[in-house]
Amino acid sequence: MTVTATERIVTVFGTGNQAGAVARALLADKTSQFKVRAISRHPDSASSRTLSALGVQVVKADGWNLEELTRAFADTWAAFVNTNSDDPLFLQKGDGPTEFDLGKNIIDSLVAAKVQHLVYSCFASSVEQTKGKLFIKPMEMKYQALKYARETGHFATTCGIYAAWYYEQFLDKATADVFGGFPTTPDEEGYITFRAPLWGDDEHPSFVSITHDFGDMVHGILLEPEQWDGKSVPAASDVMTFEQLAQTLQNATGRKSRYIPLPSWEDFGRGIPELDDHKLLFAFTQATGGRYFGDVPTETKTALRLKRRAAEAQGKSGNEANLLSMEEWFKTNFA
């Protein structure tokens, strides 16, 4: 890729949901002359080919290979990084490599490649927020990775972005089964029933449309990275209680819906080892009064501000510059 003096390369690590959304948002920019690059272990995968067809430069590199990564990040002005907590490698017991190890390797390559700006998809520290009561591995590994990046002293700016509960997870049948069939399968009484542990007392659950909003939020950060340096951004499109979630589905589809809480967070995903870390998130929100984002409040104003800043750069206005509500999303996908 030939880079002119006014062009800036933004590289996303991966081609999955978050990285793909960020790449698409940046490609839509009409003012900043961003060039978008994506790093993939499998450049021939469907997701990689899709991004390549849109104009993204897809570069092959292994996240564990420092030299490959450094070459892949060459000439990069800013990077967006999200690592996959559900990678089977990180679910193994014992002393195997951790998600922090991967994050550290990526950060070391960013430093070696002299990348100036970093947006890192992460969480607050479960240990700090619960005063040592809970250690939730995915939260802690991502938190420690961003902390390490800041401690290098290398980056001009760093920003953490905390993704809320994906709207798109409700499209997955396996996920629906875990939550009692919600939002597609009626229970024995004919209700679409959302079954999940109680959340917390003070703040409500938050949700984000990865495909419609998340990429624009990161785009907004990268338009003014200095304004977001050292901050953490709650990436939420909508906020509501679980009772309101069920009512929203009913309003959108006309199908009677309800929320029935599970007796304990320990009952969530019982017998499914892959959900052991996920169930602890309910323990976390119960321990923190519903503060899923930990050190920042649950709200959508910040996300809307970023969305509108990105929309301006993309030449969009009206409803395209607004966050997608859960009700609108339910209507589109289930009505």
From Swiss-Prot:
Q: Which Pfam families match?
A: NmrA
Listed InterPro entries: NAD(P)-bd_dom_sf, NmrA-like, NmrA-like_oxidored
The protein's matches in SUPFAM superfamilies, at most eight in alphabetical order, are given as: NAD(P)-binding Rossmann-fold domains
Q: Does the keyword Transcription regulation apply?
A: no
Ordered alphabetically, the record's keywords are: NADP, Oxidoreductase
> A single Gene Ontology molecular function, please?
oxidoreductase activity
Q: Name the EC number(s).
A: 1.-.-.-
The pathway that the record names for this protein is: Secondary metabolite biosynthesis
Give each disulfide bond as a residue pair.
none
What does the entry list under GO cellular component? nucleus
Q: Which annotated residues bind NADP(+)? A: 14-18, 41-45, 62-63, 83-85, 142, 166-169
Q: Which family does it belong to?
A: Belongs to the NmrA-type oxidoreductase family.
Report the function annotation for this chain.
Answer: NmrA-like family domain-containing oxidoreductase; part of the lnb gene cluster that mediates the biosynthesis of diastereomeric piperazines. Lna and lnb clusters encode sets of enzymes that produce overlapping sets of previously undescribed metabolites such as piperazinomycin-like metabolites or morpholine. The lna and lnb biosynthetic pathways appear to be part of a signaling network that controls the formation of sclerotia, a resilient overwintering structure. One primary function of the non-canonical nonribosomal peptide synthetases lnaA and lnbA consists in the reduction of L-tyrosine.
Query: What protein name does the entry list?
Result: NmrA-like family domain-containing oxidoreductase lnbB
User: What organism is this sequence from?
Assistant: Aspergillus flavus (strain ATCC 200026 / FGSC A1120 / IAM 13836 / NRRL 3357 / JCM 12722 / SRRC 167)
